[in-house]
A protein has these predicted regions:
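A structural micro-motif at secondary-structure boundaries
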Residues: 82-94
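Hydrophobic alpha-helical transmembrane segments
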Residues: 1-5, 40-51, 67-79
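Hydrophobic, lipid-facing residues on alpha-helical transmembrane segments of integral membrane proteins
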Residues: 12-28, 32, 47, 51, ...
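Membrane-helix interface segments in multi-pass membrane proteins
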Residues: 26-54, 108-130, 138
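Juxtamembrane cytosolic face of transmembrane helices
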Residues: 2-15, 19, 60-74, 88, ...
Length: 172
């Protein structure tokens, strides 16, 4: 295990891949919710469904972070989550990290709502929030996100496992 923090570009690529994987997980979770509760209209139990999807997302991340420190996207991009000492992340710390990670979105969305932002401003304010949050790693001496610093976790690079050459067929 290396202690080098992954570059921002690698983290953002991992997040993009993670969002595609999470789309499938949340699609199934939403389908289960609407099927089991016989949801016939999109607004029926809307807030309960939103809470359900936030909980499913949290369960997804917390499970992977506490069982090896990597989601599939993190494995693909050779990134691992560890605590500040390099050890495995306990469940309470993974939950804290998940909740703090919402700071990527909530301040920008809250500000946009408070300002009564419409159309393009509704997208611009949260996008600026995301940009500021991402580039803030350059203010951290260990190049960690703010939510990692607050949760006592770190993202580190892992060395890719070398592929073994296919065993040569031996003549008999």
């Amino acid at each position: 295990l290396d202690t080098l923090a992954p570059p921002l570009k690698r983290r953002l690529a991992s997040m993009l891949y993670e969002s595609m994987l999470l789309f499938g997980v949340l699609f199934i979770a939403a389908w289960l919710f609407s099927t089991l509760l016989q949801q016939r209209h999109a607004l029926y139990l809307r807030h309960a469904q939103q809470l359900w999807l936030v909980l499913v997302t949290g369960a997804y991340f917390v499970w992977f972070w506490t069982h090896g420190g990597q989601t599939l996207a993190m494995k693909t991009w050779h990134i691992r989550l560890v605590d500040k000492n390099g050890a495995a992340v306990p469940a309470w710390r993974a939950i804290l990290r998940y909740l703090l990670a919402w700071l990527w979105f909530l301040p920008g969305l809250g500000l946009a709502a408070a300002l009564g932002a419409a159309t393009w401003m509704l997208m611009l304010i949260p996008a600026l929030n995301l940009l500021l949050w991402a580039v803030a790693i350059y203010l951290d001496p260990q190049r960690q996100f703010l939510h990692d610093r607050l949760a006592g976790t770190r993202l580190v690079m892992t060395k890719p496992v070398p592929r073994q050459p296919a065993a040569a067929a031996t003549p008999r």
